[in-house]
Structures are given as structure tokens and as C-alpha cells.
UniProtKB/Swiss-Prot annotation:
Gene Ontology terms for molecular function: ATP binding; proton-transporting ATP synthase activity, rotational mechanism
Naturally occurring in which organism (per UniProt): Teredinibacter turnerae (strain ATCC 39867 / T7901)
CDD domains associated with the record: F1-ATPase_delta
PANTHER family documented for this protein: ATP SYNTHASE DELTA/EPSILON CHAIN, ATP SYNTHASE EPSILON CHAIN, CHLOROPLASTIC
Gene name of the record: atpC
Record protein name field: ATP synthase epsilon chain
Subunit structure: F-type ATPases have 2 components, CF(1) - the catalytic core - and CF(0) - the membrane proton channel. CF(1) has five subunits: alpha(3), beta(3), gamma(1), delta(1), epsilon(1). CF(0) has three main subunits: a, b and c.
Membrane topology: Peripheral membrane protein
Length: 141
């Protein structure tokens, strides 16, 4: 049996996951990080994208976070997300529609930097949701 650490994944709205995990993999601003039992204390901002957890049972679960922070303490891992969803609850059609809408908004920009930045952020978030859904499909194969 592998060593485990307690993991919490929470959003501003609710707790999404709480339990013992062998490994958590997330997209930090410095690059992808893998956190397991015995990892050094660590704090990093998270990029939008998938967060994978390998549970104590050996099952793997994937979550989508729109950004936030990853905190590693000696006894726990905390993912503090702006928005967090179980990847199984995500809808590919709505993610595709959001991506298309953001691409159209970017194409129609006339120079207002604020609207451009918002559209670029929406596009990055939609693309991250689609990457998360693709990770689920790969796992199912």
C-alpha cells in the first residue's frame, strides 16, 4: 500500500473533493507538478486546466480548475480554486461553444485592450476545459 496524504479541492462555492490520495498532478504557473506524501511545503498559482488525483484505492479522478492556488503542507494538499468541477460533470458542447464565442470576440476586436484581455482569458479557459475532457477520454481508453 502506498503512502497517502490528505487532499482538499475547494472552489469559492463548495468543497469538491476531500480524501486520501497517493498523488496529485496539476498545472502550476511554473509547469506541471506532481505532489505526493512527503513533498516539501509548496505554494503556487494554478493555471486553468486539469487536476488529476490518484486516490488511496488506486482509482484516478480528474477535476477542472479555472485557476487558483495549490498549497502543500506536511499533512495536506489544498487546491483553492476560483472554479472547480468534476471533469465527469463537464459538457463538451458548452466548452466548444464557449471557445468559439471567445475566438469570435477576439477576431472582432478593434483595439480596446480590456475587452481583448477578457476574450483571451475566456478562450484560455475554454481551451483548458477541452484539454480536461480530452484527458478523460484518454483515461477511458
Amino acid at each position: 500500500m502506498a503512502l497517502t496524504i490528505h487532499c482538499n479541492i475547494v472552489s469559492a462555492e463548495q468543497e469538491i473533493f476531500s480524501g486520501l490520495v497517493e498523488l496529485l498532478v496539476a498545472a502550476a504557473t511554473e509547469g506541471d507538478v506532481g505532489i505526493g506524501y512527503g513533498h516539501a511545503p509548496f505554494l503556487s498559482a494554478l493555471k486553468p486546466g486539469p487536476v488529476r488525483v490518484k486516490k488511496q484505492s488506486g482509482d484516478e479522478e480528474i477535476f477542472y480548475v479555472s485557476g487558483g492556488y495549490l498549497e502543500v503542507q506536511p499533512e495536506s494538499i489544498n487546491v483553492l480554486a476560483d472554479t472547480a468541477l468534476r471533469a465527469d460533470d463537464m459538457d463538451e458542447a458548452s466548452a466548444e461553444a464557449a471557445k468559439k464565442e471567445a475566438e469570435e470576440a477576439l477576431a472582432s476586436q478593434t483595439g480596446d485592450g480590456i475587452d481583448y484581455s477578457k476574450a483571451a482569458a475566456r478562450l484560455a479557459e475554454a481551451a483548458a476545459q477541452l484539454r480536461t475532457l480530452q484527458a478523460i477520454r484518454k483515461r477511458a481508453r
